[in-house]
Regions:
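Short, charge-rich, low-complexity alpha-helical interaction segments
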Residues: 1-7
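Short, conserved non-catalytic motifs in the polymerase core
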Residues: 75-87, 107-133, 149-162, 184-185, ...
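Phosphate/adenylate-binding "loop-and-lid" substructures adjacent to NTP/NAD/dNTP-binding pockets
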Residues: 47-121
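Charged boundary/loop elements
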Residues: 12-77, 140-156
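Short, intrinsically disordered, charge-balanced linker/junction segments flanking boundaries
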Residues: 33-44, 94-97, 255-260
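Conserved polymerase palm-domain catalytic core
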Residues: 152-153, 158, 165-260
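Reverse-transcriptase-like RNA-dependent polymerase core
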Residues: 70, 96-120, 133-142, 168-177, ...
Length: 260
């Protein structure tokens, strides 16, 4: 995917954005993709329309504005720079981002290590701001396509769901009937680090933006600002699109394991 996102609104300054209009337009696009996907799955629609709507979303100026807002204002890591050292902390920098945005080559992530409660450390890959914005756009394009496929009992990293919902689901399941029920307490070791690139790319084959996602997966990472390493597997824990890719991998892995 190349080129700039067309700005037909005439807006040049971040302060002039009407967020009510932006949010409405983004919401409508997301619902259109979801409905088109649902119709394609039941045979009353076409996947061609789904792909067309995904492309429309990826080029939408309103979606770009929403992505910039999420990355530079709402996300916890908004003040943390990637390998290029850039963050957008003020109106002028955000205005520059929205006016000069284009799909550029993926940069390596900046890898840092965060202490865990057990004394060990977990790796965190921090993409550059522009890559985070691109990932936020792709997440919005892909999420409604795959959300319809995810299991009802899946709660991790999904919009509108939380650990409290999972607890309530378990409680309701256990209290039904008088038969014994099994509870499996398991952990996927280093889930983000072990995602197969080939597996993910196969599952999103034919969808617009696949090549961009491939570049993010293969971009590598840098430690201590100087040592570069290739990435043959995994998606950085810190990448905006990583939780969605993880859920896609888990969906088909569990279906295979439990023959769902």
């Amino acid at each position: 995917m190349k080129g700039r996102t067309s700005n037909s609104t005439g807006i040049k300054d971040w302060a002039d954005i009407d967020w009510k209009v932006v949010n409405t337009q983004v919401s409508k696009l997301l619902h259109r993709i979801f409905r088109a996907t649902r119709n394609a799955r039941i045979g009353s629609g076409s996947w061609k329309k789904v792909r067309s709507l995904m492309k429309l979303l990826q080029r939408s100026f309103s979606v770009l504005l929403s992505a910039i807002q999420k990355v530079t204002q709402k996300n916890k890591g908004k003040n943390t720079a990637g390998i290029d050292g850039f963050i957008a902390i003020d109106r002028q920098q955000r205005s520059k981002l929205m006016n000069s945005w284009n799909w550029t080559e993926a940069l390596p992530t900046r890898r840092v290590y965060i202490p865990k409660r057990n004394g060990k450390k977990r790796s965190l890959g921090i993409p550059a701001i522009k890559d985070r914005i691109g990932q936020a756009i792709m997440k919005m394009a892909y999420e409604p396509v795959f959300e319809i496929s995810f299991e009802t009992q899946s709660y991790g990293f999904r919009p509108g769901r939380s650990c409290h919902d999972a607890i309530e689901d378990i409680f309701q399941t256990l209290k039904q009937g008088s038969t014994y029920k099994w509870v499996l307490d398991a952990d996927i070791k280093a889930a983000f680090d072990n995602i197969s690139h080939d597996f993910i790319l196969k599952k999103i084959e034919g969808l617009p933006g696949r090549n961009v996602i491939r570049k993010w997966l293969k971009a590598g990472y840098v430690e201590e600002w100087k040592h570069y390493y290739d990435t043959e597997s995994g998606s950085p824990q810190g990448g905006i699109i990583s939780p969605l890719l993880s859920n896609i991998a888990v969906l088909w892995s569990t279906r295979t394991a439990f023959r769902l």
